[in-house]
Amino acid sequence: MRARFGDRAPWLVETTLLRRRAAGKLGELCPNVGVSQWLFTDEALQQATAAPVARHRARRLAGRVVHDATCSIGTELAALRELAVRAVGSDIDPVRLAMARHNLAALGMEADLCRADVLHPVTRDAVVVIDPARRSNGRQRFHLADYQPGLGPLLDRYRGRDVVVKCGRPPSGRR
């Protein structure tokens, strides 16, 4: 492989392995095209909402205008594409935002995307979906105080709005 692809070989191997993992986690979001055209990093894939969860949430938000304020690679937006009146996505990371734009285009979907800090709202009347970072130093965090940004500042910033916050739970036996 290295002989054929040179310095790109490790990236191609990593992409192939990630897409295999993504097929199980995200495959049902894109039944016609699969995830073979999607872009993500290992960390982004780990943090991405699993397809069944994203679809369940999308059904609960059907008929609403929804702003995914931490859209990352676009998983929630992909689930919302046929159910929300309008879906808006934002993320502070320009690379993940570019991945979201690419991934949604692979599904034939256009979405309103912009670079923004979750603590600086860019919509007014939309339901806000927030998935704060729950990893640091490569480890998953389960205490609300460890989320970045913290839930206190998030809820203060979106006071009076309908907000959906994704919170992880520790595996059984861990607290």
Regions found by a protein language model. Give the residues of each.
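SAM-dependent transferase fold signal centered on methyltransferase-like domains
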Residues: M1-R175
